[in-house]
């Protein structure tokens, strides 16, 4: 009778451990790697570009854009998305618009790349 009771308690403990294995209030204990995607641009890189530059000059300074508008407008998008471990996801988008002759006419930096 004692062995049967011991077996039942052991089986119940094993079942309870298996059922609650996925439940954890200690989320930060689990390792999550930093995930960086896109074009990393430092504030120094962003400050090097200005209106009047050609597409070739911009590409030389910043590298190739992550996305170019496929619908005929001369718009380049440099997007950087970062998810550091357990912290909040951040995204920076640098949008550059060129005229028909390939000269930079507009710069949108959201959120702004600032030195920290």
From Swiss-Prot:
Gene Ontology cellular component terms for the protein in this record: Bam protein complex
Keywords: Cell outer membrane, Lipoprotein, Membrane, Palmitate, Signal
Lipidation (N-palmitoyl cysteine): 23
Pfam families: BamE (PF04355)
Taxonomy, superkingdom: Bacteria
Main location: membrane
Membrane topology per record: Lipid-anchor
Magnesium keyword on record: no
Lipid attachment in record (S-diacylglycerol cysteine): 23
Family: Belongs to the BamE family.
Matching HAMAP family: OM_assembly_BamE
Quaternary organization: Part of the Bam complex, which is composed of the outer membrane protein BamA, and four lipoproteins BamB, BamC, BamD and BamE.
Record NCBIfam families: PRK11548.1 (NF008585)
The name this protein goes by in its record: Outer membrane protein assembly factor BamE
